[in-house]
């Protein structure tokens, strides 16, 4: 269903982003490899969505470089999930009106494919404009995966999901052949799936940590003390030239 990402799927090298005389991201460097799930954490406005825009090419850094592997196909689901046609039904939106998907040498009936995302029988005829947030999320995931994304960018993917769909999402990511970069505040999701944490800790500092969210929190307390784990306002360094 998806092409396998090359080993170095995504490389961020010495990336900096400035706005309004402030430094949003300073000299960020990390690499995402096949099989890894990297979670971006930090307060709203810290720079997580900006990083997604840099990866997709929607914005350019003020310094540094962003490279993807030769076989990488990005798949992106953003938090708004608004790029759907309200007048289409679920099957039409996902299938594009065709009866069969071809994944390499394999063929899959589109009705069966849509059903695998928990849209069965009459649910496939529901209009997109009438779907709940969780249902819209499932439609986006189905469209993204059928397009062959092997590096997934997911913005708050667990928002609005019922328990059954959340379990299905976790299982799919756990068995995913590529890699994923995920913005999430869901610590239980991150404890189960994250292999690395990229934490926007304030003062334009981003911490790269190998491990899940719980291990990162313990390391943060060791580095910065208990006070550092409490919610705080995002701060940025001033740009100096």
PLM feature spans:
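Conserved beta-strand
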Residues: 12-15, 23-33, 64
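ABC-family P-loop ATPase nucleotide-binding domain
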Residues: 1-16
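Short beta-strand immediately N-terminal to the Walker A/P-loop
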Residues: 38-39
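ABC ATP-binding cassette signature C-motif
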Residues: 32, 43-241
